[in-house]
Amino acid sequence: MKKILLAVCIIMIAAMNMVGCRDNKGADKKPKARSAAKAKAKKPLFTPTSAGGPYEVLVVYEPNDLLTGAFDTLYNVLTDDVLGLSQAEPSFDVMKISSNNFSKNLHLCRNIIIMNIDSRVYTQCKFKYTKNVYAYPQIVMNIQAPNAEEFKRFVKTNHDVIINFFTRAELNHEAEHLKEQYNPMVREKVMNMFGCDIFSLPELNKTKTGRNFLWFSTDRVNKDMNFVIYSYPYRDKRTFTKDYFIRKRDSVMKANVPGPREGQYMMTTPFVMFNDDEVHGAYAQVVRGLWNIRNYDMGGPFVSVARVDEKNQRVIVVEGFVYSPATDKRNLIRRLEASLYTLRLPEELDLARNTFDLDEIEINPE
């Protein structure tokens, strides 16, 4: 299967074999967030569009990397399970190619990791990366190490840095795409009820309105994607505790997201993960977990982002949830997640459209 995917990637790239513009950065292993106020780079005029699908990574290796276990260590990191899903799915779909076969055509893959293990060249482990060198959008990361054992230790230690770096880049790529192809109906209804702006998935075609609540859905039997937005008064910092979130979410969903029979409604399962983050330079509570329908065999993953609308002293919650029992859910929920970060609160409506929506992981330059 991976050979087929690689062959498709090569065919797609061959039609776009042009030389891109460089945007080089040196890096060490310490991560930091790039400010949301900085403008996102636009596609250079003569740079081709990158090939490959979202969350696909091409790893370029030397033959010895297979023998020492260095490649396997990196592969295991990249394919670690996505958090918050109802079934095991890899963080990334990994293809591999030896350096001898890393042709110009393959230079246009959207995410590339090059393994550089050589004691004659490197004295310590380090990340290096470049953006949009051969195509757009694209990240080419070099992982340097003096030997295989140091490489393996470095990659394991920086597991979260690697995953978050590429994941956030993909989320921002999707957010940029949504700003060009968004759902005008959702945007209008959200503005009318909440005074907020958002770029949501074009496929959302069904709507339900409640009190301080909107629900948009693709209304599919499978691969069903849903977006909800609701608000409630902001009290104090205790508003962002786990217990408060679950109680508030369950009360809102009970009133607005029913099951097929009376007495059935959406609930939050105990499997919930909380993360404090920043969106547009302000605090955001990001929650991932699973939902189900009370007394009914139906459920799936959700992700929500809660932010404080200081102008109106309320909490605005945007959430995406998926129902797709017969298929993988990673790309579905991540498309929805990307749309959540495009939310503009009333005091943010003058933000430029080309700013970062979710702070990227940026590895410190030397």
Positions of predicted regions on the chain:
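C-terminal motif of bacterial Sec signal peptides marking the signal peptidase cleavage site
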Residues: N17-G20
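Bacterial signal peptide processing site
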Residues: R22-K25
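The feature marks either
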Residues: K30-P146, D160-I163
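Secretory pathway targeting signatures of secreted, lumenal, and periplasmic proteins
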Residues: P31-F46, A51-G52, L58-D65, G69, ...
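Signature of long, low-cysteine stretches enriched in small and polar/charged residues
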Residues: P90-E149, K254-N312, T327, E362-P365
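Surface-exposed amphipathic alpha-helical segments
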Residues: K152-H173, L204, V315-E366
